[in-house]
């Protein structure tokens, strides 16, 4: 009961005070950006939390029941043994692979791999060859056509051809000679570890889990290789974002941290280095976000009545300004994909080395300020990056070197080869430096837990 009251107070106080805060914004030194009032947003957030509480309540009942049959859970894979046995036939098997540390880069030597995946919703009722060409952009269309014609792609264990259409529930199997992109060789720092969870400081430039072209150059696979067992991520960080990550070592750890994050019982703070002179007063952005292009992970500010729109709110405070860039503390009150990056772009202060949201060749001179952009043009230009053009940003405006096609093919699979990644491919000046429980120890004001990293070097003014 005491816990519920604390949660209720956390979200009802802003609702009661929202109108007064809005009236006093100028005198209090606050700036608001958004169409919806704080009142409307906080009411939505409270409803979201209440729904999540009900979900967690039902989950806890199921957990209590499952404790009576502990052998039903496979602790090494976090799966029900019954479900796991049904999927055993389709389990993704890892081949042997070799790691090479080449100065600042961690490389994986090319290896043979059987890629297995079930049909995604956006692939339904589309030709297999069209999905390969549009979704997996690291290879040219002729490679995929040749691979399908050679019989190296199967749908539900049957050989596919160029006319094959993917249906809901289809299992796609693709035999491939895999070339993973290099990632940074910076070490993964462990901040905290017990029997159930591990808290790490994730380096920039490494994906969290296998996705797209990455498998063994990912946080979960690196740790699995070092630890000898599976760890599951509890919070999300973009590939380029660095900072605090929670990884569950057991189902108990996954449930504990996951439930707190979903119920908004965690305060998160980031630090970013942005373009220009950020306002000295606190800035609050309440603008919905939506995914514009899944292949490019492109997100944008939108109206709440648009399909796919999600409420989003971020609080910003300037730490310092050096005449060109500002160091800003960012506090997301929701956890939408690219939320901080897009809200900063909306304000006209994108992250200074952001290869997506601070590239003037893509967004024009205003860098997408106010959400103003022709997204058909934006998507077309972003599509060229990493193939014909290296990634660039406001800070690295000349582009310089980076990952592009190098006009050379693999002697084994004849796929196009790429140059090594550059600074815009590996680094982003956005760092998650603090995660803290919103709840306190009984009878004290001390938070139940708090994890913190040092500021990254780029955030330290000399």
From Swiss-Prot:
EC numbers for this chain: 5.4.99.28
CDD domains: PseudoU_synth_ScRIB2
GO CC aspect terms: cytoplasm; mitochondrion; nucleus
Biological process, per Gene Ontology: enzyme-directed rRNA pseudouridine synthesis; tRNA pseudouridine synthesis
Catalytic reaction list: uridine(32) in tRNA = pseudouridine(32) in tRNA
Keywords, alphabetical: Isomerase, Mitochondrion, RNA-binding, Transit peptide, tRNA processing
Pfam families to which the protein is assigned, alphabetical: PseudoU_synth_2
Record: active site: 238
S4 RNA-binding domain location: 127-188
Domain of life of the source: Eukaryota
Localization, UniProt: Mitochondrion
Disulphide-bridged cysteine pairs: none
Further comment found in the protein's record: Present with 639 molecules/cell in log phase SD medium.
Listed name of the protein: tRNA pseudouridine(32) synthase, mitochondrial
UniProt source species: Saccharomyces cerevisiae (strain ATCC 204508 / S288c) (Baker's yeast)
């Amino acid at each position: 009961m005491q816990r519920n009251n604390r949660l209720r107070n956390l979200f009802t106080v802003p609702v009661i005070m929202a109108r007064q805060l809005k009236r006093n914004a100028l005198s209090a030194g606050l700036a608001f950006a958004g169409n919806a009032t704080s009142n409307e947003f906080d009411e939505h957030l409270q409803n979201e939390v209440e729904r999540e509480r009900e979900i967690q309540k039902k989950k806890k009942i199921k957990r209590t029941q499952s404790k009576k049959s502990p052998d039903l859970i496979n602790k090494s894979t976090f799966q029900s043994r019954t479900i796991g046995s049904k999927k055993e036939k389709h389990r993704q098997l890892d081949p042997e692979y070799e790691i090479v540390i080449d100065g600042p880069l961690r490389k994986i030597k090319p290896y043979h791999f059987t890629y297995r995946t079930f049909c995604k919703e956006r692939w339904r009722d589309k030709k297999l060859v069209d999905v390969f060409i549009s979704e997996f952009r690291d290879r040219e269309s002729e490679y995929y056509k040749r691979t399908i014609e050679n019989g190296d792609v199967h749908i539900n264990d049957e050989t596919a051809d160029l006319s094959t259409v993917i249906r809901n529930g289809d299992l796609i199997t693709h035999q491939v000679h895999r070339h993973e992109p290099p990632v940074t060789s910076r070490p993964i720092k462990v901040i905290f570890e017990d029997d159930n969870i591990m808290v790490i400081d994730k380096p920039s430039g490494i994906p969290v889990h296998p996705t797209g072209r990455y498998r063994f150059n990912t946080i979960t696979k690196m740790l699995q290789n070092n630890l000898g067992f599976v760890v599951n991520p509890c919070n999300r960080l973009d590939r380029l974002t660095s900072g605090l990550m929670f990884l569950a070592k057991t189902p108990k750890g996954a449930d504990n941290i996951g439930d707190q994050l979903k119920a908004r019982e965690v305060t998160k703070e980031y630090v970013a280095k942005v373009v220009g002179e950020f306002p000295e007063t606190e800035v609050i952005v309440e603008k919905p976000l939506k995914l514009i292009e899944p292949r490019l992970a492109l997100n944008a500010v939108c109206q709440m009545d648009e399909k796919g729109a999600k409420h989003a709110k971020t609080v910003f405070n300037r730490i310092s300004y050096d005449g060109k860039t500002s160091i800003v503390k960012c506090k997301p009150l929701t956890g939408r994909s690219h939320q901080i990056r897009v809200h900063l772009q909306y304000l006209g202060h994108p992250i200074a080395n952001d290869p997506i949201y601070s590239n003037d060749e893509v967004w024009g001179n205003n860098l997408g300020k106010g959400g103003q952009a022709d997204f058909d043009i934006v998507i077309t230009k972003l599509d060229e990056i990493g193939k014909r053009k290296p990634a660039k940003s406001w800070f690295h405006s000349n582009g310089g070197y980076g990952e592009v096609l190098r006009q050379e093919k693999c002697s084994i699979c004849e796929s196009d080869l790429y140059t090594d990644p550059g600074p815009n491919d590996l680094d982003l000046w956005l760092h998650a430096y603090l995660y803290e429980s919103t709840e306190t120890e009984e009878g004290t004001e001390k938070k139940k837990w708090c994890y913190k990293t040092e500021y990254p070097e780029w955030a330290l003014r000399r």
